[in-house]
């Protein structure tokens, strides 16, 4: 990022075409094209550059949702950011994008209770086994890794205990065993921690919390590196887990004061 985090937040998302400080809210389920040639050309562009904001149906997004994705991708310093209707939707998308029946995942014990319910109960129905590790004793993480382990899911700090983990050590273990990693970074946000830059494959933030800042919108973001992009992209298109334009606009608005609010929180 060429500008500072704070400067970027204050000067992003402006609509220079209409000379407006804020971007317009574009609501569209159906996209208009001039001809069949035009739609085929757009579809070809989307296939060649799936992060480029090319869409032929509202479920794939509009210019309003794309603006938010571009902002968050810059903030996360990631390959791409997917936005979901809720923060937990991003958790679901991350896990289901990279796991299949017969796989195992290892999860930090003090995770957000819906995440625990998903991993401990719901995944069983898909023959995906979850093992929990003690964040204060990473030996429990290492010893539970098997040939079936596909993902290590971290929460830092923990939702229930607010404990901080040795992220570099976790990443070292994962890379040595060639296991994918995901982190719920809702408390930290990329203002304090950039997990993709650190080495994580996926980073989740509940946009409902600090991003929006006004308790009037639900949303989530899932930042990814290039390695897992295709898996998440395909899962997102199949499941339809995408944030709508109105919520995208409200989160974009809230981001302008993210640094001010978090600085005050951390005093």
Protein language model regions, located:
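Residue-level marker of positions within ordered structural domains that often coincide
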Residues: 32, 77, 225
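Conserved PLP-enzyme active-site core in the AAT-like
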Residues: 6-13, 80-267
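A generic structural signal for short, solvent-exposed coil/turn residues
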Residues: 2, 19, 49, 75, ...
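N-terminal glycine-rich, Lys/His-bearing helix-loop that initiates the first secondary-structure elements
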Residues: 1-52
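Conserved N-terminal alpha-helix of the aminotransferase class I/II PLP-enzyme fold
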Residues: 35-89, 117-121
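Alpha-helix initiation/capping motif
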Residues: 16-18, 57, 61, 134, ...
């Amino acid at each position: 990022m060429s500008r500072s985090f704070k400067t970027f937040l204050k000067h992003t998302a402006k609509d220079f075409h209409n000379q407006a400080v804020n971007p317009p809210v574009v609501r569209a389920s159906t996209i208009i094209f001039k001809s069949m040639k035009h739609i085929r050309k757009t579809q070809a562009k989307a296939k060649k550059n799936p992060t480029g904001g090319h869409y032929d149906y509202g479920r794939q997004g509009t210019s309003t949702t794309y603006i938010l994705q571009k902002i968050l991708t810059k903030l996360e310093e990631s390959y791409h950011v997917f936005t979901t209707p809720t923060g937990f939707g991003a958790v679901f998308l991350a896990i289901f994008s990279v796991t299949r029946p017969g796989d195992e995942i290892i999860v930090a014990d003090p995770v957000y209770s819906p995440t625990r319910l998903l991993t401990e109960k719901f995944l069983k129905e898909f023959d995906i086994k979850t093992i929990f590790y003690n964040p204060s004793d990473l030996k429990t993480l290492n010893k539970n890794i098997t040939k079936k382990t596909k993902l290590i899911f971290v929460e830092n700090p923990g939702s229930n205990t607010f404990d901080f983990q040795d992220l570099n050590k976790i990443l070292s273990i994962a890379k040595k065993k060639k296991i994918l990693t995901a982190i719920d970074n809702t408390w930290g946000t990329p203002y304090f921690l950039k997990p993709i830059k650190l080495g994580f494959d996926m980073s989740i933030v509940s946009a409902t919390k600090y991003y929006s800042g006004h308790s009037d919108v639900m949303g989530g973001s899932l930042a990814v590196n290039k390695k897992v992009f295709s898996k998440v992209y395909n899962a997102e298109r199949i499941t339809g887990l995408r944030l709508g334009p109105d919520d995208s606009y409200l989160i974009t608005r809230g981001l302008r004061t993210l640094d001010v609010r978090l600085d005050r929180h951390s005093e």
